[in-house]
């Protein structure tokens, strides 16, 4: 894939091909790491059911903590990529923005992972610790040929707007500079400003799905706009696993990301 021409590590390239579509060179990732931060939310109480639904819908990968492998591994049908999340923090912690490392790259390899991910809250009071973790783990990923996804979110006392194009661009660039192969960050809400974020980041950017939207059309239009602005995929959790038709919304997202269909056409995939 052309966007990974700068990566010479064969192991990384092989694994990246498992979580990116070779034709569109984009990805649809369904994060299910919310159980650690927010508890057993609707939609992920039984992770195996959700994993099977998004796999049937055409998602490229699921993302979660090591427990996802034990309790949500796909038992039949088409395979789906596995991304192990290495960071943890909870909404009931004294500092919900602080993320700590709870597993290793080596453990992710033993679990059969195709990539690992880290969460960094740029602007948090403990952000320097998360920067250190990202930089050091990127070296370990290089040694083992493991792709690294950095979730770079502007969050903290000085962050007034988490979608501010300047802070989103800074967060994305920071992740790439510290060694991430793929950046997951906020969509700015506007294609023109997001284009500038993409231009300023040497690593491909996958947009976060964000909080649950009011309508499917609103959500899918955001995905469409982000792809046209240079995004290389979407990583959406709640807008997928809390949907009444998990398989259908996944198919709709894939139609837009991989086939560039119009939103009205993609909406036809949703049956409920």
From Swiss-Prot:
Record Gene3D superfamilies: Aldolase class I (3.20.20.70)
Keywords from the named record: Amino-acid biosynthesis, Aromatic amino acid biosynthesis, Schiff base, Transferase
InterPro entries: ADH_synthase, Aldolase_TIM, DeoC/FbaB/LacD_aldolase, DeoC/FbaB_aldolase, FbaB-like
GO biological process: amino acid biosynthetic process; aromatic amino acid family biosynthetic process
Active site: 33 (proton acceptor), 153 (proton donor), 184 (schiff-base intermediate with substrate)
Enzyme class: transferase
EC number: 2.2.1.10
Statement: the UniProt record of this protein carries the keyword Transferase: yes
Keyword Endoplasmic reticulum belongs to the record: no
Superkingdom of source: Archaea
Transmembrane segments: none
Binding site for 1-deoxy-D-threo-hexo-2,5-diulose 6-phosphate: 33-37, 153-155, 209-210, 237-238
Catalytic reaction annotation: 1-deoxy-D-threo-hexo-2,5-diulose 6-phosphate + L-aspartate 4-semialdehyde = 2,3-dioxopropyl phosphate + 2-amino-2,3,7-trideoxy-D-lyxo-hept-6-ulosonate
GO molecular function: fructose-bisphosphate aldolase activity; hydro-lyase activity; transketolase or transaldolase activity
UniProt-listed NCBIfam families: ADH_synth, PRK07226.1
HAMAP family: ADH_synthase
Subunit structure: Homodecamer.
The protein's role, per its UniProt record: Catalyzes a transaldol reaction between 6-deoxy-5-ketofructose 1-phosphate (DKFP) and L-aspartate semialdehyde (ASA) with an elimination of hydroxypyruvaldehyde phosphate to yield 2-amino-3,7-dideoxy-D-threo-hept-6-ulosonate (ADH). Plays a key role in an alternative pathway of the biosynthesis of 3-dehydroquinate (DHQ), which is involved in the canonical pathway for the biosynthesis of aromatic amino acids.
Family: Belongs to the DeoC/FbaB aldolase family. ADHS subfamily.
Designated name of the protein: 2-amino-3,7-dideoxy-D-threo-hept-6-ulosonate synthase
